[in-house]
UniProtKB/Swiss-Prot annotation:
<dbReference type="GO" id="GO:0005737">
    <property type="term" value="C:cytoplasm"/>
</dbReference>
<keyword id="KW-0676">Redox-active center</keyword>
<comment type="function">
    <text>Redox regulated molecular chaperone. Protects both thermally unfolding and oxidatively damaged proteins from irreversible aggregation. Plays an important role in the bacterial defense system toward oxidative stress.</text>
</comment>
<dbReference type="GO" id="GO:0044183">
    <property type="term" value="F:protein folding chaperone"/>
</dbReference>
<dbReference type="InterPro" id="IPR016154">
    <property type="entry name" value="Heat_shock_Hsp33_C"/>
</dbReference>
<dbReference type="GO" id="GO:0051082">
    <property type="term" value="F:unfolded protein binding"/>
</dbReference>
<feature type="disulfide bond" description="Redox-active">
    <location>
        <begin position="268"/>
        <end position="271"/>
    </location>
</feature>
<dbReference type="InterPro" id="IPR000397">
    <property type="entry name" value="Heat_shock_Hsp33"/>
</dbReference>
<feature type="disulfide bond" description="Redox-active">
    <location>
        <begin position="235"/>
        <end position="237"/>
    </location>
</feature>
<keyword id="KW-1015">Disulfide bond</keyword>
<dbReference type="GO" id="GO:0042026">
    <property type="term" value="P:protein refolding"/>
</dbReference>
<protein>
    <recommendedName>
        <fullName>33 kDa chaperonin</fullName>
    </recommendedName>
</protein>
<comment type="similarity">
    <text>Belongs to the HSP33 family.</text>
</comment>
<keyword id="KW-0862">Zinc</keyword>
<keyword id="KW-0143">Chaperone</keyword>
<keyword id="KW-0963">Cytoplasm</keyword>
<dbReference type="InterPro" id="IPR016153">
    <property type="entry name" value="Heat_shock_Hsp33_N"/>
</dbReference>
Length: 290
């Protein structure tokens, strides 16, 4: 079971989220049949979305778009406050060999571009916020977004580790944020600890990576666990939703589908589930328009 644990330092100067997103990213890889670099890039963006959504309340939905200029194309993810996230990468077939340290290259294949966050509070007026991609490694781009757009100094680490067959081995991450009222010496102490932290990939390799992340973040300082919540890859598509999408088409288009294709087939971009609509379905839609 994937989870996100929310914590705060006893002093109230900092808060931290730590995540195990292994099953989330594994499900995404299986559904989209992504190759190595596409898997890691999509996985990191899914984790970034889980972090951002955990910061929201109510029925808020949050869309993250990594709009890069290189071979991966766009990466789109959508998360909600109930722990659900879905997403896809425009080019799932980017398969670049690992570096000498075993890391999968991502940044060069994301390229330059924008990190776009759309926050939908359900009021009909979603809020858009855009920052430039500074590295294409996703974690650094998320930290820059939080610091620049939300004016909250943040440290982010997230990664996806693959096994020898390029299947998802483990995935997770952390977010540390300075809270209002933090003293200069507290900030300096935490900055030093973050700078001295082992690489996120090293922490994820630990037997209990959640505890390893918390230990690396807080050291010997006291902290409180505020909550532990389940997170998952879950798409909200349905036959009814795509039926409504078809209903928005002109009658002439529906008639053409009926006569030439004898139906319609739609595949959800986010989860690759295919929905079929027969001639009777199309007839019903055409009749409703008349």
């Amino acid at each position: 079971m994937d989870k996100i644990i929310k914590t705060i330092s006893e002093s109230g100067a900092f808060r931290a989220f730590v995540l195990d997103s292994t099953e989330t990213v594994r499900t995404a890889q299986e559904k989209h049949q992504t190759q190595a670099s596409s898997t890691v890039a999509l996985g990191r963006t899914l984790i970034a979305s889980q972090i951002l959504a955990a910061n929201e309340k109510g029925n808020t939905k949050l869309t993250v778009k990594v709009l890069g200029s290189s071979s991966l194309g766009a990466i789109i993810t959508v998360a909600d406050t109930k722990g659900n996230v879905k997403g896809y990468v425009q080019n799932p077939g980017v398969d670049i060999k690992k570096t000498a340290t075993g890391e999968v290259l991502v940044g060069p294949f994301v390229g330059n571009g924008q990190f776009l966050v759309i926050t939908d509070y359900g009021t009909g007026n979603p809020y858009n916020s855009i920052t430039p991609l500074i590295s294409g490694e996703i974690g650094e781009d998320l930290a820059f977004y939080l610091t620049e757009s939300q004016q909250t100094p943040s440290a982010v680490g997230l990664n996806v580790l693959l096994d020898e067959e390029d299947k998802v081995k483990i995935a997770g991450g952390f977010l540390v944020q300075v809270l209002p009222g933090a003293k200069k010496e507290e900030i300096a102490r935490f900055e030093k600890r973050i700078q001295e932290m082992p690489a996120i990939s090293t922490l994820l390799e630990s037997d209990d990576h959640i505890e390893a992340l918390l230990k690396a973040i807080y050291g010997d300082e006291a902290y409180k666990r505020l909550s532990e919540e389940e997170i998952r890859f879950q798409c909200d598509c349905s036959h009814e939703r795509f039926m409504n999408a078809l209903a928005s088409l002109p009658s002439s288009d529906l008639q053409e589908m009926k006569e030439e294709d004898h139906g319609a087939e739609i595949t959800c971009q986010f989860c690759q589930t295919t929905y079929n609509f027969d001639e009777k379905d199309l007839e019903e839609l055409i009749r409703d328009k008349s």
